[in-house]
């Protein structure tokens, strides 16, 4: 699952974990993992991690608009859903992976239960209104399959 974590959705964790547990039961191969790929507020935060390490508050519509403006400042043709501009940004994905990993590590001092992809960690991420992205974990996983 990929979704933006927003303050309005904090109470939806119990619904989400029910769906996740249902999908886990439906797996034919128990080694297949059901992953949550989350980014705080909006996808533009993940895109900005391709350019810099930062973790601003992204709780309001104004915050999301600011994030969109930051992406447009570094990629002027960017619009949501535009393949060409997103592909240009994606070329810098190794930087985004490093920056996203650092944002997660920095959250340990705020109470993040650990870096491992567990239900406890994901519940914490979904309910604390901190800025982060776990998209890097899927990319690292896929890169590991190539080896």
Positions of predicted regions on the chain:
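C-terminal accessory helical subdomains adjacent to catalytic cores in phosphodiester-
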Residues: 5-147
